[in-house]
Amino acid sequence: MYNGILPVFKDRGLTSHDVVFKLRKILKTKKVGHTGTLDPEVSGVLPICIGSATKVSDYIMEMGKTYKATVSLGITTTTEDQTGEILEQTAVNEQDVSAKSIDDVLQQFKGELIQIPPMYSSVKVNGKKLYEYARNNQVVERPERKVNIYQINRISDLRFVDDTCQFDMIVECGKGTYIRTLATDIGKALGLPAHMSKLTRTQSGGFDINESLTLEDIKSLHEHDTLLEKLFPIEYGLKGIEQILITDNAIKGKILNGQKFYKAEFKQNIDDIVIMVDNETHKVLAIYEPHPEKLDEIKPKKVFN
């Protein structure tokens, strides 16, 4: 039985659930989960949690992501990417846009932004996913969401192809950011129709695309009993959360039994979630959080036993 995190390379054409389904068959276990949906037409790294590591998937999802995207100026589509039908089309040439004007606009999108999710997305409104409304030609009011763009930079020359202007950019962002919506909004800021014509996720949850494994890699490693050495430990998915090292065996036992504690029993000031770590093995024992009612106590959120 495997317990850990695998950075998987998702090919275009597969859904995130397809990857989970295939891995369940390869590894012969149902305890497999992904760390946030990656659209079918997007390739890149998809961290997969296996066994007890499924308990930390929410924390991996909260970590930042990095994308390499191609923006095409001159065309907007129904889906905001290359798969949709054309909504608006304008010929773009070298007199209409420059590298400097694009670079200036990109920096306007750095920081906290308000985004409206695209109609073709899995965001739910009134219990239904937006793409279900879109397929029935229904447009509904979509909730605004705050997203964070930490870095955004053009990384290629401008390419003028078939009356469009294309360029590549790198975007470092927080959870819930729609890059295709960002591409469309960049076009609006330039006064031009735009869409995202290609997208690759290069980093997610602290994992890089260069260390990710294909499904074929994983199948081969599993068959040769060498997959275990490629697994990242559960602790890797909890980076950035304060640790409390536990040396007392009696306290370890209480933690593994899911008992509550008084905050005063620990030296640290506990104002947020913390992870209890075995001082000898450096393995995570549990995740604890402040009690919502008893302010002087902490209670277990997840226990790893």
From Swiss-Prot:
Keywords: Isomerase, tRNA processing
Pfam families tied to this protein: TruB_C_2, TruB_N
EC numbers, comma separated: 5.4.99.25
Keyword tRNA processing among record annotations: yes
Catalytic residues in the record: 39
Transmembrane segments: none
GO biological process: mRNA pseudouridine synthesis; tRNA pseudouridine synthesis
Sample GO molecular function, one term: tRNA pseudouridine(55) synthase activity
InterPro entries: PsdUridine_synth_cat_dom_sf, PsdUridine_synth_N, tRNA_psdUridine_synth_TruB, TruB_C
Domain of life where this protein originates: Bacteria
Enzyme class: isomerase
Catalytic activity entry: uridine(55) in tRNA = pseudouridine(55) in tRNA
Function: Responsible for synthesis of pseudouridine from uracil-55 in the psi GC loop of transfer RNAs.
Family to which the UniProt record says this protein belongs: Belongs to the pseudouridine synthase TruB family. Type 1 subfamily.
Protein name: tRNA pseudouridine synthase B
Organism the protein comes from: Staphylococcus saprophyticus subsp. saprophyticus (strain ATCC 15305 / DSM 20229 / NCIMB 8711 / NCTC 7292 / S-41)
